[in-house]
Amino acid sequence: MKKQIFLLLVSAIAYCSCTKSPAQSLCDGETGASPKDIQPQKVTVGDFNAISATSSVDVVYIPSDDETSVEIRASKAVLPYISVQVDAHETLVVGMKKPKDPTKTKGIKEVHVKARPIGSLSASSSGDIFVKDGLHVKGTLRLTAGSSGDISCQDISCKDLHATSNSSGDISGKSV
């Protein structure tokens, strides 16, 4: 019995040692992407005043008064499954399309967004939003994280801040 428990423990440790960075999958071999396999792809979108990240895609949001751009960064195999669109409420929605074979979507999946300061950020279903270089909004800033979605930003300034977190969603920030 001790041998069986020992073998099970060794197997579990060996399996866990395959773990890469949090943005990459476990032992993904040919289906995942390492940073050198990333294929950047520019996306043209309409005007938006909010960002929503869903379905295990990370959004890196860079506030910029000068430029608006959206770029997907993922392996060539994953690119067709990443959805970036502006909905009827003028929200940039970033997520995943459901593939027939879920192993096709393993690996690094990031969307880099440069846009004017946005007043509403929402992360859900393991989608994460990372705000770089601070966020300065003249009016109200709404942050909503749920279903394991996370929002991380530093150096926040706004008139009113409304932050909601539930279902394992996290919101973190400094200098609010």
What residue spans do the PLM features occupy?
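Short, surface-exposed interaction patches in beta-rich subdomains
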Residues: C153-V176
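Positively charged n-region of N-terminal signal peptides that target proteins for export
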Residues: M1-Q4
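Active-site-proximal flexible loops/turns
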Residues: L9, I62, Q154
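Acidic (Asp/Glu) and glycine-rich low-complexity loops/linkers
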Residues: C18-S124, F130-T144, S157-H162
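Bacterial N-terminal signal peptides
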Residues: L7-Y15
